[in-house]
């Protein structure tokens, strides 16, 4: 009867009734979904309040422990989070200890709820670390790691680590940890001192069966800034991370470093070890690569300077930048333990227009490989006010296939070698002449397609503190590329020397720009 009565209603009335039914269904259906907007609301609210420093609840025994003791506290793999779900992703957690002395809140997000993942000492094997069980009952986690069978289907591997400040590390198939990324850098290399924002809370979406990606949200906090982040992790030969970020300023900052990367450079062919070492090179990265908005490619080999060094590259709407590990042969490093040949490069691919700004490279002196002494980031020319978020999106690539990042129509630098400058005498013996020599190998498909007799030359510029005494380019039949030999005399060794070079054939540019700084006091 109801159907008959409704069928006799005027058409307009029927449509109105149907619309009301649909609206009622929408209002009563489970339409809730967690998003970066939820985190951004918290970040904006935090930015409007005074900063509250995180409080440590860590017993002194754990705070004062040595690294060897901290390493003994291992997560029990059989207790991995989501181990009973039909998903290849698992979570494991870091215990607090040493300078990781502040808990972070970690939540699981499902289609209907947000639930905190509670700390329990049962997650961990404490090894020989003696402790009072009551003192660790409610500690909280220091961070977490993402587990995924990236190298073989029957073996779980750690592919991402989030531990300390806003640091995170990522690897792809066949890679080992090296370079780190961060959420935000503030006042890096300024006399006032650097401020290290920290991720204070995470939300991790429970993956569905068959999902090949993992979604992580993070809330960032520091004395002068807050932020909301969304990370989408895609494991693979090159693991990629899509990053969506919204940063709010609490107070004025001297320098805001977006998409920061942190790495290590101790020595290499362009700056050999001052002491005899069987390893030809020791570094997580050996150069900064920039793809500028105007299409120019720049390669800046890294240094371990004797004094803090900051290099700036003005770039509007960058197409990409990163700290790369060029050189993938084991013989380039000869290190069986630390496998620097397997450490990934990190490449930032901006999404959308970033506007006017600069890529900055910071090089810090270090005496050993335990200190990360290289930082690179993009900093905007104009900072937003406290009520306006600075929103930047980008994709992070962690790769060992550096040549695939590069434009195929432009040659790139495969290695930079430094040597004592010399001149061959009439008796064929080479004698030093007080100059410094650099040998730069350029390779790439564009060069392989050229005949060895092609008149390739180098456009070179040297700063006021250097005098060029040789600029020679010759074909390299081994690499099917060209080698630039550049010799210069330094006027004042207490000052650095800036150099730039690129290969050309007539009016055509063949290569990226090699941009190098010979450090002072060397």
Swiss-Prot record:
Q: What does this protein do?
A: Involved in the biosynthesis of osmoregulated periplasmic glucans (OPGs).
Q: Which GO terms describe its molecular function?
A: carbohydrate binding; catalytic activity
Superkingdom, taxonomy of origin = Bacteria
InterPro entries with a match to the protein in the record: Gal_mutarotase_sf_dom (IPR011013), GH-type_carb-bd (IPR014718), Glucan_biosyn_MdoG/MdoD (IPR014438), Glucan_biosyn_MdoG_C (IPR007444), Ig-like_fold (IPR013783), Ig_E-set (IPR014756), MdoG_OpgG (IPR023704)
Q: In which pathway does it act?
A: Glycan metabolism; osmoregulated periplasmic glucan (OPG) biosynthesis
Q: Name one GO biological process term.
A: beta-glucan biosynthetic process
Q: Which organism is it from?
A: Serratia proteamaculans (strain 568)
* Keywords, in A-Z order: Periplasm, Signal
Q: Does the keyword Isomerase apply?
A: no
Could you state one GO cellular component term attached to this entry?
outer membrane-bounded periplasmic space
Q: Which family does it belong to?
A: Belongs to the OpgD/OpgG family.
Query: Which gene holds the coding sequence for this protein?
Result: mdoG
Q: What are the boundaries of the signal sequence?
A: 1-33
User: Is the keyword Disulfide bond assigned to this protein?
Assistant: no
Q: What is this protein called?
A: Glucans biosynthesis protein G
Q: Provide the protein's localization.
A: Periplasm
């Amino acid at each position: 009867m109801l159907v008959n009565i409704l069928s006799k209603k005027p058409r307009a009335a029927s449509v109105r009734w149907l619309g009301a039914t649909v609206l009622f269904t929408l209002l009563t259906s489970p339409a809730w979904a967690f998003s970066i907007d939820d985190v951004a609301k918290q970040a904006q609210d935090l930015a409007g309040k005074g900063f509250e420093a995180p409080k440590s609840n860590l017993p002194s025994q754990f705070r004062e422990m040595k690294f060897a003791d901290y390493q003994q506290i291992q997560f029990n793999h059989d207790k991995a989070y989501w181990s009973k779900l039909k998903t290849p992703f698992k979570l494991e957690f870091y215990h607090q200890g040493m300078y990781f002395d502040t808990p972070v809140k970690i939540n699981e997000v499902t289609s209907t709820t947000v639930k905190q993942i509670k700390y329990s000492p049962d997650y961990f094997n404490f090894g020989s670390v003696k402790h009072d069980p009551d003192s660790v009952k409610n500690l909280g986690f220091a961070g977490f790691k993402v587990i995924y069978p990236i190298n073989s289907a029957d073996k779980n591997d750690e592919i991402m680590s989030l531990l300390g400040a806003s640091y995170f590390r990522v690897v792809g198939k066949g890679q080992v940890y090296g370079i780190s990324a961060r959420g935000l850098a503030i006042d890096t290399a300024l006399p006032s001192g650097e401020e290290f924002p920290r991720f204070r809370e995470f939300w991790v979406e429970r993956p569905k069966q068959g999902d090949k990606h993992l979604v992580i949200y993070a809330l960032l906090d520091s004395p002068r800034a807050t932020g909301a982040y969304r990370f989408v992790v895609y494991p693979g030969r090159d693991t990629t991370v899509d990053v969506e970020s919204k940063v709010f300023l609490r107070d004025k900052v001297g320098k805001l470093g977006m998409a920061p990367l942190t790495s290590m450079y101790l020595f290499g062919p362009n700056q050999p070890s001052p002491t005899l070492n069987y390893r030809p090179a020791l570094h997580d990265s050996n150069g900064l690569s920039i793809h500028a908005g105007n299409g120019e490619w720049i390669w800046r080999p890294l240094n371990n300077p004797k004094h803090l060094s900051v290099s700036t590259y003005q770039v509007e709407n960058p197409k990409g930048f990163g700290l790369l590990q060029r050189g993938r042969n084991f013989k380039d490093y000869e290190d069986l333990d630390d496998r620097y040949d397997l450490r990934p490069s990190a490449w930032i691919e901006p999404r959308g227009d970033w506007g006017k700004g600069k890529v900055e490279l910071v090089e810090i002196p270090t005496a050993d490989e335990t200190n990360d002494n290289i930082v690179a980031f993009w900093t905007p020319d104009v900072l937003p006010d406290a009520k306006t978020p600075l929103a930047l999106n980008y994709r992070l690539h962690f790769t060992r296939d550096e040549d695939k990042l590069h434009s195929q129509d432009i040659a790139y630098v495969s290695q930079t070698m430094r040597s004592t400058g010399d001149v061959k005498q009439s008796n064929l013996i080479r004698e030093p002449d007080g100059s410094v020599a650099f040998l730069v190998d350029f390779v790439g498909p564009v060069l392989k397609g050229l005949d060895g007799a092609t008149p390739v030359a180098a456009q070179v510029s040297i700063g006021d503190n250097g005098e060029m005494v040789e600029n020679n380019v010759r074909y390299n039949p081994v690499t099917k590329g060209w080698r630039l030999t550049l010799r210069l005399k330094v006027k004042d060794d207490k000052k650095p020397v800036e150099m730039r070079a690129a290969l050309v054939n007539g009016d055509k540019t063949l290569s990226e720009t090699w941009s190098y700084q010979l450090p002072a006091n060397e």
